[in-house]
Amino acid sequence: MKGFYMYYLGIILASVIGYFLGSISWSIIIVKKVGNIDIRTVGSGNPGATNTVRTLGKKWGLVVAFLDALKVVFTAIVAILLSMIPNDLFSQTSYFIPCIFALIGHCYPIYYKFKGGKAVSCFLGLLFVVNVLYLIIFLIIWFISVAISRKVSVASMFSALIILLIMWIPYLSGVSYFIWEWNGLEKFRVAWKNYILFSLLNSFHYWFSNTWASGILEGNIIILIGGLILAWRHSQNIKRIKNKTEPDTFPKKVKPVR
């Protein structure tokens, strides 16, 4: 039995904790607390940051987005703490894999009958954990896309698609060629020694003098899974976009006729 769990107990524990953290719906909690409204009964009915904007305004929508992203980051911190336990069962605890379970918990929360958000804010948290540079690129593309389309759904899906394409460029991870090995410690070592910390949290493996760190391939697979979940959660939006019935999240202000 120990052979099965060898090296992976930390991943399993962090993933379970991540799912329960991800299942906390900040939009439901905050909208109920601030406006005494069940967010699932107003607007799009989706318990997420965008519907919070529609219900309470941009300020509270930003708060919800930040807290939802933080669920993924906290999950990574749990994994980091577990990896520091001086035991083989925790020595290869991935900081990436548990984070996808936080995203799944956000979309399918056990506390709310498995009906949750659309993964965008948690996807931002996932990008921060895997590669900060991906997060910066996503946000730049997102803001430009929102300004053009006025639709958060379009901006989110388009930005995620761009990340899924460019993440295969090795230089964006601070290395000169793609790392196919599951253990990325040796290949990342030079980049981290030179303080090229695009993969900021992953570098904690190095600073803790560990013998293992997640490779680029693992991070990309996790981002790919997160991107596919994001697209799946936007399936109804995609249908409305095709039918040209998707409403603007931020409608253009019409100047009054004088």
Swiss-Prot record:
GO BP, one annotated term: phospholipid biosynthetic process
Keywords, sorted A to Z: Cell membrane, Lipid biosynthesis, Lipid metabolism, Membrane, Phospholipid biosynthesis, Phospholipid metabolism, Transferase, Transmembrane, Transmembrane helix
Keyword Lipid metabolism on entry: yes
Cited InterPro entries: G3P_acylTferase_PlsY (IPR003811)
GO molecular function, a single term: acyl-phosphate glycerol-3-phosphate acyltransferase activity
EC annotation from Swiss-Prot or TrEMBL: 2.3.1.275
Membrane topology, from the record: Multi-pass membrane protein
Cellular-component GO terms for this entry: plasma membrane
Pfam families referenced in this protein's UniProt entry, alphabetically: G3P_acyltransf
Ranges annotated as spanning the membrane: 11-31, 62-82, 94-114, 124-144, 160-180, 212-232
Subunit-structure text: Probably interacts with PlsX.
PANTHER family assigned to the protein according to its UniProt record, in alphabetical order: GLYCEROL-3-PHOSPHATE ACYLTRANSFERASE-RELATED (PTHR30309:SF0), INNER MEMBRANE PROTEIN YGIH (PTHR30309)
Sequence similarity: Belongs to the PlsY family.
UniProt protein name: Glycerol-3-phosphate acyltransferase
Gene name of this polypeptide: plsY
